[in-house]
Amino acid sequence: KTMKKITLFSILAVLFAAMSFTSCNTDGDSGMNFLTPEQQKSFQYAMAAGSYNNMAILYETKNDANVKNQVDSVASSCSISMYGDSTMTMTNFPVAALAEHISNKDLAAAIAKVAPKAIKCKYNVMPNSTSETAYFIACPEAINLDLTYGTDNKSHKVVLYFIPSQMYYGYCTLKEPRQLGFQFALYQIWVDGNQTNFIQNSTNSSNTTVGFLFRNAWKK
């Protein structure tokens, strides 16, 4: 069950190994060892000092023309809060790209019309961080949508929930050139206060999550 949910992250880790993700099973991190609030803020201030304008959001998409490349991307940028409040903002998140992974056709059609959004992410720096690189867990906050769809054309409150990578920490280099990246996944869709089972990954129908990777854009 768990392996199915993290298969995408395994694939992305192979495809983009150059991004230097660090395993969540890093030696010395027992799960009970945390940074002090002062240490946490110190790392967050150091991360916020960087510029992250040339970024990309990679996401799963069905590609019948090239089954070995089931990933697409959009340009993005990131700003990390300078207040040490564990938040960063990712721009141009492609909400419409989720449509192909939604089994409810009416909802999928409505999602396909949603414009890209800037979304806030919460993050927490991990104790295995160094003076060179901050390792962290990050996840977008829920996206709330008011959508009108269906044969009755009724308004529905739709909430998209995400989870962080179950395998790898995100990373942020603290010296130039700055490199930043983390993985996450769409995990649940709620409609009008009820959890649904509408997520059906178009690249793997047994997958009930949709994977994303946020990182520096490759130089052309």
What are these regions (language model features)?
Residues 3-48, 218-220:
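Bacterial Sec-dependent N-terminal signal peptides
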Residues 34-220:
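First exposed extracellular module after export/assembly in secreted or surface-exposed proteins
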